[in-house]
């Protein structure tokens, strides 16, 4: 299913293909086209990888690239990090499958027509937006 770009808004929750972790890459012995085999790129050890949800924070969505904050499963220590916003599954189960952390400190720009696979939710609720803005302010002040 293709993405309807007219339905992409700031604060939308999207599904993004972030790339293949280096540890999953089979180094070819011949001249195999790596971009053909790994179209979303090969990530180093600490780069965000695989398919994850993200929240669009760009204001100008007509650009080919947009800025997002990725979401991932909540891990031990996330609550102590001021650059992380924790979302409880029980409160947001209409779009989350488990407790989730917004990685505000992993803000990144992506090529929207290549990386975005689908729009999950057209916009997140205002309380989540406020938490993201506060975490951004605390992280980058």
Model regions: which residues?
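C-terminal terminal-subdomain/extension
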Residues: 1-6, 80-141
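Loop/turn positions that initiate beta-strands
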Residues: 10-11
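Short, Lys/Arg- and Gly-enriched loop/turn segments at beta-strand edges
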Residues: 21-35, 41-45, 49
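Residue-level signal for secondary-structure boundary sites
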Residues: 24, 76-77, 112
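Compact nucleic-acid interaction/catalytic patches
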Residues: 40-92
């Amino acid at each position: 299913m293709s993405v309807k770009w007219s339905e992409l808004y700031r604060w939308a929750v999207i599904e993004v293909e972030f790339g293949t972790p280096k540890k999953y890459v089979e180094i070819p012995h011949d001249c195999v086209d790596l971009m053909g085999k790994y179209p979303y790129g090969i990530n180093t050890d600490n780069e965000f990888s695989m398919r994850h949800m993200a929240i669009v924070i760009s204001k100008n969505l007509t650009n080919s690239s947009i800025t997002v904050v990725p979401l991932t499963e909540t891990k031990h220590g996330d609550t102590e990090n001021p650059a992380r916003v924790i979302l409880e599954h029980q409160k947001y189960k209409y779009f989350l499958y488990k407790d989730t952390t917004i990685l505000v400190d992993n803000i990144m720009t992506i090529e929207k027509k290549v990386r975005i696979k689908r729009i999950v939710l057209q916009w997140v609720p205002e309380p989540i937006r406020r938490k993201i803005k506060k975490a951004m302010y605390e992280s980058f002040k």
